[in-house]
C-alpha cells in the first residue's frame, strides 16, 4: 500500500482562491498545507480582472498591499457610454467612492504569480505541487484521505492524509463533481464573450472602467490593468466584448482560456469609434483573443460534506457582470481560514464557514443575473431614461454585494 503524505489541509487548485486560502491559513498559524495544481507549470495566463475593495482589504491584511499597488491600477470611476462614446452615467469606485481601500484592475496571471510567490516564501517551496489533479477522496475515522493523479509518471496516484479538503479547483472542479455529481450543469446566458489585452495610449484619466452598449445590448467593457504600462504613459487595456443571442455549443469546453478569432467578434463593433478610443483598432491589435460563453450554475443547497468543502467558482460560479468572481473567492478564503483558526473541530469549522459564506454568494449569483437582465432591458430606452435606470441598478447591486464582506 502506498504511504500517504500527512498534512493538515489539502487545497485543490492553485488559482487566486486556492493560493489566498493557503496564505490566510498561514496567517492563522496553520502551516501544514498542500496545494495541488493540475497544470504542470503555473504561468501568468489570462487577462484582466477586477478585485473589489472588500477583497483588497483582505489582501492588504495579508501583507500584499505594496505588491498589488505596484502591479495593478486603482480604478477611479465606472463610466457607462453609448456605442458612440457619449457618457450616460458615471459612478466613483474604490477610494473615490469613499471606500477605505481601492478597487484594483489587475492581470489575473500577475495576481496569481504574486500570490504564488508569497505562498512559497511563507509556507515553503514544496507547498504548491503541480501536475497533480484531485481524483477522489474518502473520509476516515480521524480525517480525510485525498487521492491525486500525476499528469506525468504514468499517471501514478499520490495520496494525502489531512483534516480537511478544500475544493478551489474552479469551473470544472473535480471536488465538486465528487460532492455533487448531479449539480455540475452549466447554465448559459445566451451571451458570447470575447476577451483580450491591447496596449494603447491612456484614455480618459487612465483609471476609468468603461461599459458601452448599443440598442441591441451588444456590450464593450474596457479598463487599464497594468501599473507598469501606466508608468510609461501607456495603458494595457483589458477588454471584454459581450454579444447576445449568439448560437452556443456547450459541448465545447466552457473555459476562460479558449482561443477566439478576431473575425468572429469584429463585425459587431465595426463602427464603434469614440474619438478617444477606436474600438475596432483596440480589438484588432490585441495580443490574444479568448472566447467563451457566459455561464453560471444554480446555487447549491450545501457546499460541503464532512471534511470536504468548496470555495470560489467551484462553489458559486457566477456571471462576470458584477466583476465579483475573484473577490468572492478571496472573501471565501479568508472566512474559511478564520473559522479553521478559531475552532478545533474541523467539521464544525467548515459548517460555520459555509453558514457565513453561502448565503451572500448565493445572493450575488442571483444579483448578477438580475443586473444582466436589467441592463439589457434598458438598451432601447432613450438616453435620459437610461441614466436614472443605471443609477438604480448599480445602487441595488451594491447593497447586495456589501452584505458579503468578511467581518
Swiss-Prot record:
InterPro entries: FAD-bd, FAD-dep_Monooxygenase_BioMet, FAD/NAD-bd_sf. Keywords: FAD, Flavoprotein, Monooxygenase, NAD, Oxidoreductase. GO terms for molecular function: FAD binding; monooxygenase activity. The record marks 219 as: Involved in substrate activation for the transfer of oxygen from the flavin hydroperoxide. Disruption phenotype: No antibacterial activity toward E.coli or B.subtilis. Its EC number is 1.14.13.-, 1.14.13.218. It catalyses: phenazine-1,6-dicarboxylate + NADH + O2 + 2 H(+) = 6-hydroxyphenazine-1-carboxylate + CO2 + NAD(+) + H2O; 6-hydroxyphenazine-1-carboxylate + NADH + O2 + 2 H(+) = 1,6-dihydroxyphenazine + CO2 + NAD(+) + H2O; phenazine-1-carboxylate + NADH + O2 + 2 H(+) = 1-hydroxyphenazine + CO2 + NAD(+) + H2O. PANTHER family: 5-METHYLPHENAZINE-1-CARBOXYLATE 1-MONOOXYGENASE, MONOOXYGENASE. This is Phenazine 1,6-dicarboxylic acid hydroxylase PhzS. The lineage of its organism: Bacteria, Pseudomonadati, Pseudomonadota, Gammaproteobacteria, Lysobacterales.
